Amino acid sequence: KVKYIPCSLDLNRFKLKTSEWPKKIALGWTGTFSSKHYLDSIRDVLYEVDKYLDIKIILITNFDYSLEGLDYEVIRWRESSEISDLHKIDIGLYPLIQTNWALGKGGLKALQYMAAGIPAIATNFGTVKDFITHEKNGFLVDSTKQWVNAIKMVAENTKLRNNIIINARNTVETNYSVSSNEKKYL
């Protein structure tokens, strides 16, 4: 008998972000060089959003990256600072390119954002459709225009943003935490 066990996070590690919503919004992406092409796929989104909102881009990664003309920071990923680095992000971005390879991705980064109290915006493709319900616990987007609109909605609508944060954390606690899945392992 085969049983699917989803990505599972230790919520004792992934504490909720508690800081106030800033005037300058930090859009964040986390990933390695092997997933750089996903970040490249939303470059235009970042430049477009910068026309409407006061933003900073936070990239948590293992490689150098340039976003000339934008306010951005590259933070080297380290396990010891992973959570505190994630807490520098206000909106988490999880872009994918629609390929067979991407279908196999488990959506871990989006789940990490959700667990940490960071609203997640993801490409409407693959596994994320199993755990993100659009405008309830995150956003699923298909185009540059939808990326931009979702970022603006999260930034400008406090009630929606707060509901997404609460619902996202509940989703992870209920279905994607170690404690919710431990019986499946044993």
Segments the model singles out, each with a brief description of its role:
Residues 134-145, 153-159:
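Conserved acidic donor-binding segment of nucleotide-sugar-dependent glycosyltransferases
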